[in-house]
A protein has these predicted regions:
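Short amphipathic alpha-helical segments
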Residues: 12-13, 89-91, 126-128
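Short hydrophobic/aromatic beta-strand micro-patches
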Residues: 18, 94-96, 131-133
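Helix N-cap motif at beta-to-alpha junctions
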Residues: 21-22, 98-100, 135-137
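Conserved glycine-rich beta-strand-loop-beta hairpin in the small C-terminal domain of fold type I
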Residues: 48, 63-73, 83-96
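Acidic-histidine catalytic/liganding microenvironments
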Residues: 79
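PLP-dependent enzyme catalytic core of the Aspartate aminotransferase-like
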Residues: 107-117, 122-158
Length: 158
């Protein structure tokens, strides 16, 4: 487990594993022991501060992300050829582009200034992944450009 993404301190470099199974725990310790450097003081202090005083901030973050998720779902629902999968406990949204007449939706959206993650990275052809953990103004701009890309490429005119 790690608080690094939730509290936006990825450089803190502190994570932990909770494992009741002694055999599995030993394998985990052996496996990651040489891969992960020792935690630094900053990581401990940042994590302690987040655990002791970060609940209000975390709840505000979750509320903000819910608003971004709602905006994303409603917007994609109104763009022909795109479909959203349910987002469960994540700030990453999967958009199906199967109904678009384009071989590579990633490149289509990139031409309009929206850099999404191509589904091929995850063995999901004709899909893209979008990160909603961003200022709402960025998400609004990205959705506007996605809508423009679809409209200018004949999808909305069919």
């Amino acid at each position: 487990m790690s608080l690094n993404k939730t509290f936006n301190f990825p450089g803190a470099g502190l994570a932990w594993v909770v494992c009741k199974n002694d055999i599995l725990r030993k394998k985990v310790v052996e496996g990651v022991g040489s891969l992960i450097p020792e935690a630094q003081l900053f990581g401990y202090i940042a994590t302690q501060a987040a655990l002791e005083d970060g609940e209000h901030w975390r709840l505000s973050l979750l509320s903000y992300l819910r608003g971004n998720r709602k905006l994303l779902l409603e917007s994609i629902d109104n763009i022909p050829g795109l479909h959203m999968y349910d987002m469960e406990a994540s700030y990453l949204g999967w958009i199906s582009c199967k109904d678009l007449p384009h071989k590579d939706p990633f490149k289509l959206f990139l031409r309009y200034g929206v850099a999404l993650q191509p589904g091929e990275m995850f063995n999901a052809k004709n899909h893209v992944r979008i990160n909603i953990a961003t200022p709402r103004s960025n998400l609004i701009e990205a959705l506007s450009r996605i809508n423009e890309a679809i409209g200018k490429n004949g999808i909305m005119n069919d």
